[in-house]
Amino acid sequence: MNLASSACLLLLFLLGIAQALPVQNEEGHEEGNKEGHGEEGVEEGDEDDFVDFTTRILTSNNNTDQLLLEGDLVAPTNRNAMKCWYNSCFWKKASNGFVVIPYVISSQYSRGEVATIEGAMRAFNGRTCIRFVRRTNEYDFISVVSKNGCYSELGRKGGQQELSLNRGGCMYSGIIQHELNHALGFQHEQTRSDRDSYVRINWQNIIPASAYNFNKHDTNNLNTPYDYSSIMHYGRDAFSIAYGRDSITPIPNPNVPIGQRNGMSRWDITRSNVLYNCR
């Protein structure tokens, strides 16, 4: 084999190696294979196992200009604080036994993101009598939009009510379920009237301007136990002044996990059934 033939074979070999390597963008990150992801490459599998949902929610809401209570609840304008008088903020139960909640989803979302949102909604099917259905002409409905943050009204507002799921930070099934639970009328677990028997609020570790987010409410606990594993429970460092300075500590066992990442707990499901009298 002459020298020219050897050089040609060597060049073909090197080109084959180059084509087998992953393509990288300008920042050096691999591109191309995103098997199992939605159209935007965002799915629940992307989640960092060490980041809880409330941390993601509060981080996403840092840049919002929406007036929020407790980090992700739209401040009410048509009723007293966080109270729901005479069940006025609960969704109505139909004669067929289902609580039908109409919704529309903004065209801002990709098909993959719509699938993620509707998949989180379907988590209620089969385990509760709650059914999220696409709106036809119903007066009361949820409008899912991508604004700056992840947030919701508390319960049924009446008419159109926005539920924001920012495309950049809220496209996780657990976050979507968290906000849907707010829309059903559920508050954060650590604001329960009996919370002081189960968690200690470390006021000295909380950003002073955010301390009001830890106020207790006169809640209806539906005869269910305090649930450390609830998807509605803050993580232990929510609104903390510094990393490692926990704002919430479980008691008596400080090592009990809170601020989970896996979706609705058994008691979250039970409360939906009790609140809406599911059979």
Swiss-Prot record:
Residues 26-40 have a biased composition (Basic and acidic residues). It catalyses: Hydrolysis of the inner layer of fish egg envelope. Also hydrolysis of casein and small molecule substrates such as succinyl-Leu-Leu-Val-Tyr-|-7-(4-methyl)coumarylamide. Residues 1-20 form the signal peptide. Keywords: Cytoplasmic vesicle, Disulfide bond, Glycoprotein, Hydrolase, Metal-binding, Metalloprotease, Protease, Signal, Zinc, Zymogen. GO terms for cellular component: zymogen granule. One of its GO terms (biological process) is proteolysis. It is an enzyme of class 3 (hydrolase). One of its GO terms (molecular function) is zinc ion binding. Zn(2+) binds at residues 178, 182, 188. This is High choriolytic enzyme 2. The lineage of its organism: Eukaryota, Metazoa, Chordata, Craniata, Vertebrata. The gene is hceb.
